[in-house]
């Protein structure tokens, strides 16, 4: 050791006190300084040591050898201890120490010697380091002898090897503890997380001890080693090595050299500091720690942290139990433990690195603190918007951080290891705090403290807005009092009104009382709730600043009178409604929170009240009697007492704007009646204001609202209003109104806005589409909706939405874009563009038989919507409900109607309920119960390749666009590393379909973690907040079963009432029928004479004969069924006699011709039927009636679901054309499509949407048709049976063999027939294969079908079903069709066109000279093939009127004859072929009778009357060449007879029609020249009558 340079510290210069670089990087030693606390590095020139030894007498003549000295390492440590162990001088500072008295931590002033503390710490850290070397170590024992000053530290685990060092030739324990610069931590290539680094450690303790003993046992060598050093390690005793059995352990016992630290022994402060360090070990080393033989109760880091928070509470005087979130812990990595607590306004930290107590923090503390402060800064910015920006250091002052970390090869500022300098990148691990950790932090008081600090910081800003006693204010909205701001200002009154409209009333009153003492200022909406607002928010609130300026208020000033203010009184003038009460409350809240002393000044705050109802007699301008009411309960009580009096008129004053200027002047002339002073605020009333407006009092508000009882109102007859009465009797009405608007009823599951919409729709019987914006206007006018129509439009849209996650049963039918699951309804179109109507299903839910039993609300004396509906099933469970009110919120998921109906039936049968789980229509994912009242909704994800996954369902109410945004964020990798490469979007408005590509590495990780978890494809929904209004008050239900039981009880009562009501009504009808029968019979028998008598006499006679009077005149109409009943006009002077006479109008109003014996017989039959009906109802129980309604409901539910599924299948099976412009290909014609269709189980009747079948099969199908002549053939479908009435009219195949008629094109550019409404030239329609079959109208139909299929009820064109037809009527004499007539053929028209086509001249343009027709997909028609496949009928019916078989039609060619992309083969001509025999040739029917007279017909030349575009009138149509009119008689002169022509027609159409056509491609495009307009809403056409 003597050969070593005492200043050579090259082995440890990476971690020297001058080293600020990571390990293994060398740095030149800087120039040393006198008394420096930093160790020295390599020194080449000893001249650098100048100044090491101080000279007190520099004038002495000393030689150079004495001046320059070289010390040994040991001598240098003793000479300059501050370089190694810190200062040896006593230091006083505030530190955390252990208090034996309070048995906890204590933050106090401590006087200690840092060097002494450090040598003890080195031994403790060595013991803790052994835990990293041997994981089996589990105990540390520390013994402190206060009397002798001796300290010992014992630990088990692997001991020090008792072996001879091969190089140093000494035992290893002696080498480690008795020789400097020895360590096992010099290999920086090893990633060690121990505290030892420099090779000093325990040797420093030995050096500064008078006695130092090491004792260790090696179980492998079975030896025990003990050795003692004395006199500052200068004397070493002989090692004692003995044989021993037992476990390994190491024990260090030392007695510090207190003299070198200026101490005589251990004092109280040092003992407290040593004990705190022992407790540090217990909390951080993860081993059992004993102090003086007793086990320390601290088991983990969290318990250790709680010692500090208890001390903080104790210092505050809070001796209560710790809060739930007082200490928040997080351990995102095995090497990190992080704790958070709220500080008292200064940043505090307690941290450990490898069990070393880091008193000055360092990079590890900054690493954690920066993350927390960054998250807190985000929240501060959100909650303190537009306020003063806080710096991170200001936020840091409010947090207390605990860190226990294991850092690889840590570097410190000095050997004292008070501050870590290792860079974050070299920690060897990461500690990214979890999101849940942040959420828990935000729930503590830290945010409140930070915001409070921000508010204090903003005080200066608020003082800038303080008002002063100025005589003039610059604000155009303010009408200032003339004396405001003067010495008489305290007599002035500032009137605050609710909006500009109310300002007019105040201004009119101001004119009465004079402008000198009254000022007026209108408020804009509701005042800010300053109870939980920041100062920045208040400072930016213009209304509050205006009030401060106008009154002259100064921030935080205490007022005892108003003499220093511009206004001495503040008058609130608002509407007498709930919102007006809320505005008053907000103003009171502002004054109490900001200027509480003002509310203790008498007469400062007053309110101006106006009547809410006025009643009078006589002329409203000059009434004989008049009375005003200031509350509705007060008016209702008066009405109950005086309702029988006649002549009273009433008027509701819903707002201050209802009052006229004359009314205002009357009010202000009687100020004593209309002014109500608020009583001075009492101390206990402050809590009431906080209860009403503080967010922290939400739970207390729930109880307050539940205690509300209907009929509560504030009595305005008192002179002064207390704040207690205002809160409990007036403001609570606003809270209740808010809850009623937001929380649904348990009976019908509706909120008032939804109820108003349904009431309006039921009242209007809204069966036709109406714009949403228009319906909102009707609802607002019908039901007195008092809020904006925008929210009402959203309510209507919500009732009609059907996408996954919305309604299970929608009451309104959507017609237009009402939103989808892409954005959760946010993608809904504007209310101006969408339509809705009542869904027919709605009356299955809200039965009309219940309407007379319901209680209706009233507004302004008029009946409006019901208080509550009583649906057949609990809609609150079927459609769910969500809402947030005052103090209450509600969240009820959707349930399956099938399950609900089954359980209702089980309740009727007395059986237990089956458990139900949430269910959403259309959701294909999995729903599982994950605990009591908790359900997990999982999406669907599956692995489709080595690097690919497919997502086909998302958790409920996770919208497609939101999930797509998340995928984009993952790809951007701004927050977290990306684990996906790309994705493909195949989503539709109803289906979810993502295909995601991943790297192989990430794919394996995702599979190991779970694909569902990796992509967050699950969401939990709870049923713990089932809040709803029961029939009496707001209630929180414990379970869904409780809601079912509550609904069951209410609904069953209504079924009993419904039965009684129906029996009562039936009995009335029976009595009327009986009286009518007896009345008519008596007249017939001559027992009653009604002629030549006065009405009064006749009424008296009827009463004498016991005819029952029915006073309702409306019932007289029912008495005569559909016959009109004569009602005599009322005479206001006739009085009770007239009322009595009207009661017999059901008899006297019967028509004279009904006074017959036949009528008597009919009435008797009706009486029998009615009696039978009554008996049937009597036998039914209320449960039976309910079960019948439930069956109707569930059958309709299933039918609607089946219909919706069928419509979706048909739309999905519709083909897609090839588009040369958009580069899309056709779909649906291949084997794969047929296979897919078969797999879906599609109805084979959906043929009109499928690709055409082969010609062979088509021909075979047609040959099965039965004979019977042309007319019999025309009356039936060729291959389908006649649909039954149960099918709802025509079947899908009713469209077979029908086409649009086409007129001759004799004249250039002539229109065959104009459509009933203009067509858009930009719209094309592709005629489908079903249209090919629509050639001949069906005989069975009473009227022909329109050219465009009518719309279904949901606004979409019907695809498969034709509208029901009425009975055929006689057809008048044919006349030329007008443009407004339908475009279809009946039997006679068909023959007329046949004859016209036969009369056309032959036109055979060269096919080679034709231009190639372009095709594009521009169709949205209902079927796949257009009528362009057929061309004119005469094109297929060759030979009619022609002897040579050539074509005689100049109509456009068959679509199949045109050249098509990818096919140059046209339709083979059949003109020269002879007619084949047909089974219809033997028919003897004379079809010539069907042909009109032989008057020659020329080609029609129709001049266009407007811009309507027809099928054949396009400028690009090169086939439509002008043709001269045919010569007269040409059709008759040509070869065949009319009958033969008809037979030829039949042959072509029935037997050989499909043979004539080549097999068309799966999807035929529409030729651009032949453009047709698709009318989505065709105008109804007049049906043509058949003769």
Swiss-Prot record:
Protein residues bound to Mg(2+) 2: 575, 577
The residue ranges flagged as biased composition, category Acidic residues, are 1-15, 1321-1334, 1379-1391, 1419-1430, 1512-1521
Matches recorded under PROSITE patterns: TOPO_IIA, TOPOISOMERASE_II, TOPRIM
Q: Write out the GO biological process terms.
A: DNA topological change; resolution of meiotic recombination intermediates; sister chromatid segregation
Provide this UniProt record's keywords sorted from A to Z.
ATP-binding, DNA-binding, Isomerase, Magnesium, Metal-binding, Nucleotide-binding, Nucleus, Phosphoprotein, Topoisomerase
Q: How is the cofactor bound?
A: Binds two Mg(2+) per subunit. The magnesium ions form salt bridges with both the protein and the DNA. Can also accept other divalent metal cations, such as Mn(2+) or Ca(2+).
Q: What is its EC number?
A: 5.6.2.2
Q: Where is this site: Transition state stabilizer?
A: 832
Which residue intervals make up region (Interaction with DNA)? 381-383, 381-386, 1016-1025
Ranges for domain Topo IIA-type catalytic come to 743-1190
Residues flagged as site, Interaction with DNA: 526, 529, 701-702, 751, 785, 791, 959
Output compositional bias ranges, type Pro residues: 1558-1568
Cofactor field: Mg(2+); Mn(2+); Ca(2+)
Entry's family note? Belongs to the type II topoisomerase family.
Report what the protein is called.
DNA topoisomerase 2
Q: Which organism is it from?
A: Penicillium chrysogenum (Penicillium notatum)
Q: Which gene encodes it?
A: TOP2
């Amino acid at each position: 050791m003597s050969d070593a340079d005492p200043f050579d510290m090259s082995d440890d210069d990476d971690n020297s006190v001058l080293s600020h670089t990571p390990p293994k990087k060398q740095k030149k030693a800087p120039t040393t300084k006198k008394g420096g606390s930093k160790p020295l590095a390599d020194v080449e020139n000893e001249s650098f040591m100048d100044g090491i030894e101080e000279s007190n007498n520099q004038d002495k003549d000393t030689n150079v050898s004495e001046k320059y000295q070289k010390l040994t390492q040991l001598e240098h440590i003793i000479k300059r201890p501050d370089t190694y162990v810190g200062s040896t001088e006593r230091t006083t500072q505030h530190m955390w120490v252990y208090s034996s008295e309070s048995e906890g931590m204590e933050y106090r002033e401590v006087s200690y010697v840092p060097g002494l503390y450090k040598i003890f710490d080195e031994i403790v850290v060595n013991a803790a380091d052994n835990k990293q070397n041997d994981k089996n170590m589990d105990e540390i024992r520390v013994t402190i002898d206060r009397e002798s000053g001796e300290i010992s530290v014992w630990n088990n685990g692997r001991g020090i090897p008792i072996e001879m060092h091969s190089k140093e030739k000494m035992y290893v324990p002696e080498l480690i503890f008795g020789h400097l610069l020895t360590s096992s931590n010099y290999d920086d290539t090893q990633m060690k997380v121990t505290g030892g680094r420099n090779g000093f450690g325990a040797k420093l303790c030995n050096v500064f001890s008078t006695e130092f003993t090491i004792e260790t046992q090696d179980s492998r060598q079975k030896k025990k080693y003990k050795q003692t050093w004395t006199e500052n390690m200068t004397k070493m005793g002989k090692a004692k090595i003995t044989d021993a059995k037992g476990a390994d352990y190491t024990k260090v016992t030392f007695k510090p050299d207190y003299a070198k630290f200026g101490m005589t022994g251990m004092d109280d402060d040092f003992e407290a500091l040593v004990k705190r360090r022992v407790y540090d070990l217990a909390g951080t080393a993860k081993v059992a720690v004993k102090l003086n033989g007793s086990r320390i109760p601290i088991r983990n880091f969290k318990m250790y942290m709680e010692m500090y928070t208890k001390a903080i509470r104790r210092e505050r005087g809070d001796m209560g139990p710790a809060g739930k979130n007082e200490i928040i812990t997080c351990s995102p990595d095995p090497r990190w433990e992080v704790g958070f607590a709220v500080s008292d306004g200064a940043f505090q930290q307690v941290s450990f690195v490898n069990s070393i107590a880091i008193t000055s923090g360092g990079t590890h503390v900054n690493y954690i603190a920066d993350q927390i402060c960054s998250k807190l800064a985000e929240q501060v910015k959100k909650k303190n918007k537009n306020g003063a920006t806080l710096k991170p250091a200001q936020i840091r002052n409010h947090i207390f951080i605990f860190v226990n970390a294991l850092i690889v090869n840590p570097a410190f500022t000095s050997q004292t290891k008070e501050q870590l300098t290792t860079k974050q990148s070299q920690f060897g691990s990461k500690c990214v705090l979890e999101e849940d950790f942040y959420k828990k932090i935000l729930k503590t008081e830290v945010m409140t403290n930070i915001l409070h600090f921000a508010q204090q910081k903003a005080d200066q800003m608020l003082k800038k807005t303080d008002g002063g006693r100025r005589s003039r204010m610059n604000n155009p909205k303010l009408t200032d009092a003339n004396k405001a701001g003067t010495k008489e200002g305290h007599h002035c009154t500032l009137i605050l009104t609710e909006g500009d409209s109310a300002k007019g009333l105040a201004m009119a009153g101001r004119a009465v009382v004079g402008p000198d003492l009254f000022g007026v200022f209108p408020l804009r909406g509701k005042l800010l709730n300053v109870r939980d607002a920041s100062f920045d928010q208040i400072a930016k609130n213009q209304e509050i600043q205006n009030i401060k300026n106008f009154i002259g208020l100064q921030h935080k000033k205490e007022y005892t009178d108003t003499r220093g203010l511009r206004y001495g009184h503040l008058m609130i003038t608002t509407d007498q409604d709930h919102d007006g009460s809320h505005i008053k409350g907000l103003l009171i809240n502002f004054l109490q929170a900001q200027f509480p002393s003002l509310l203790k000044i008498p007469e400062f705050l007053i309110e101006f009240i106006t009547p809410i109802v006025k009643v009078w007699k006589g002329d409203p301008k000059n009434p004989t009697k008049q009375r005003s009411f200031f509350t509705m309960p007060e008016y209702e009580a008066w009405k109950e007492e005086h309702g029988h009096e006649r002549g009273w008129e009433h008027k509701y004053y819903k707002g201050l704007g209802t009052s006229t200027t004359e009314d205002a002047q009357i009010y202000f002339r009687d100020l004593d009646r209309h002014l109500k002073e608020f009583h001075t605020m009492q101390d206990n009333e402050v809590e009431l204001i906080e209860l009403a407006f503080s967010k922290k009092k939400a739970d207390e508000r729930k109880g307050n609202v539940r205690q509300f009882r209907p009929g509560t109102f504030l009595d305005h007859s008192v002179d002064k209003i207390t704040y207690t009465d205002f809160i409990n009797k007036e403001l609570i009405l606003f809270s209740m109104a808010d809850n009623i608007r937001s929380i649904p009823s348990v009976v019908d599951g509706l909120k008032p806005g939804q109820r108003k919409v349904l009431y309006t729709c039921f009242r209007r019987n809204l069966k036709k589409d109406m714009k949403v914006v228009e319906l909102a206007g009707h609802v607002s006018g019908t039901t007195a909706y008092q809020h904006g129509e925008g929210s009402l439009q959203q309510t209507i849209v919500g009732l009609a939405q059907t996408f996954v996650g919305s309604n299970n049963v929608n009451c309104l039918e959507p017609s237009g874009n009402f939103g989808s699951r892409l954005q959760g309804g946010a993608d809904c179109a504007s209310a101006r563009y969408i339509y809705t109507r009542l869904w027919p299903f709605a009356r299955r839910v809200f039965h009309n038989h219940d309407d007379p039993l319901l209680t209706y609300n009233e507004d302004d004396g008029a009946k409006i919507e019901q208080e509550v509906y009583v649906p057949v099933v609990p809609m609150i469970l079927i459609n769910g409900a969500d809402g947030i009110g005052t103090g209450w919120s509600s969240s009820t998921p959707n349930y399956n109607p099938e399950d609900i109906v089954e359980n209702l039936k089980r309740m009727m049968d007395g059986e237990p309920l089956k458990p139900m789980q949430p269910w959403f229509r259309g959701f294909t994912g999995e729903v599982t119960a994950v605990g009591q009242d908790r359900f997990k909704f999982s999406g669907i994800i599956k692995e489709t390749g080595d690097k690919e996954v497919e997502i086909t369902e998302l958790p409920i109410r996770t919208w497609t666009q939101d999930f797509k945004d998340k995928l984009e964020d993952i790809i951007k990798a701004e927050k977290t590393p990306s684990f996906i490469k790309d994705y493909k979007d195949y989503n539709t408005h109803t289906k979810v379909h993502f295909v995601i590509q991943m790297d192989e590495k990430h794919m394996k990780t995702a599979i190991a973690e779970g694909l569902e978890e990796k992509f967050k494809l699950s969401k939990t929904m709870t049923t713990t907040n089932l809040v709803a209004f029961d029939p009496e008050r707001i209630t929180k239900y414990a379970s869904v079963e409780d809601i079912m039981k509550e609904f069951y009880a209410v609904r069953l009562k209504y079924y009993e009432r419904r039965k009684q009501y129906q029996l009562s009504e039936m009995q009335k009808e029976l009595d009327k029928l009986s009286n009518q029968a007896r009345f008519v019979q008596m007249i017939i028998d001559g027992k009653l004479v009604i002629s030549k008598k006065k009405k009064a006499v006749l009424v008296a006679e009827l009463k004498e004969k016991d005819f029952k009077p029915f006073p309702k005149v409306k019932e007289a109409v029912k008495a005569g069924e559909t016959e009109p009943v004569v009602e005599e006009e009322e005479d206001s002077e006739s009085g009770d006699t007239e009322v009595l006479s009207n009661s017999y109008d059901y008899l006297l109003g019967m028509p004279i011709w009904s006074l017959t014996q036949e009528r008597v017989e009919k009435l008797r039959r009706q009486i029998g039927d009615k009696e039978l009906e009554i008996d049937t109802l009597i036998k039914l129980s209320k449960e039976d009636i309910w079960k019948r309604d439930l069956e109707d409901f569930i059958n309709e539910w299933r039918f609607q679901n089946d219909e919706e599924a069928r419509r979706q299948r048909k739309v999905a099976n519709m083909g897609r054309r090839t588009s040369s412009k958009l580069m899309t290909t056709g779909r649906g014609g291949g084997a794969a499509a047929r296979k897919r269709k078969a797999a879906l189980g599609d109805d084979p009747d959906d043929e009109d949407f499928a690709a055409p079948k082969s010609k062979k099969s088509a021909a075979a199908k047609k040959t099965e048709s039965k004979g019977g002549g042309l007319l019999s053939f025309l009356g039936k479908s060729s291959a389908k049976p006649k649909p039954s009435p149960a099918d709802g009219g025509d079947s899908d195949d009713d469209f077979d063999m029908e086409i649009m008629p086409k007129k001759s094109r004799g004249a250039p550019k002539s229109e065959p027939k104009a459509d009933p409404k203009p067509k858009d030239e930009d719209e094309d329609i592709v005629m489908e294969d079903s249209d090919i079959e629509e050639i001949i109208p069906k005989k069975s139909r009473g009227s022909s079908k329109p050219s465009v299929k009518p719309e279904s009820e949901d606004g979409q064109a019907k695809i498969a079903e034709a509208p029901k037809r009425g009975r055929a009527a006689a057809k008048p004499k044919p006349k030329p069709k007008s443009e407004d007539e339908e475009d279809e053929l009946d039997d006679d028209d068909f023959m007329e066109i046949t004859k016209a086509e036969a009369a056309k001249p032959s036109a055979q343009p060269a096919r080679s000279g034709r231009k190639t027709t372009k095709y594009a997909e521009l169709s949205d028609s209902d079927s796949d093939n257009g009528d362009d496949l057929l061309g004119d009928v005469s094109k297929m019916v060759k030979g009619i009127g022609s002897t040579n078989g050539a074509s005689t039609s100049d109509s456009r060619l068959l679509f199949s004859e045109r050249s098509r992309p990818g096919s140059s083969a046209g339709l083979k001509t059949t003109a020269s072929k002879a007619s084949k025999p047909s089974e219809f040739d033997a028919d003897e029917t004379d079809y010539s009778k069907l042909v009109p007279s032989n008057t020659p017909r020329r080609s029609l030349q129709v001049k266009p009357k407007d811009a309507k575009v027809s099928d054949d009138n396009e400028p690009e149509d090169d086939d439509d060449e002008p043709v001269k009119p045919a010569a007269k008689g040409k059709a008759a002169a040509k070869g065949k007879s009319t009958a033969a022509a008809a037979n030829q027609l039949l042959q072509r159409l029935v037997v050989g029609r499909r043979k004539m056509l080549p097999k068309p491609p799966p999807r035929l495009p529409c030729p651009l020249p032949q453009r047709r307009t698709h009318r989505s809403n065709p105008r109804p056409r007049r049906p043509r009558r058949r003769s």
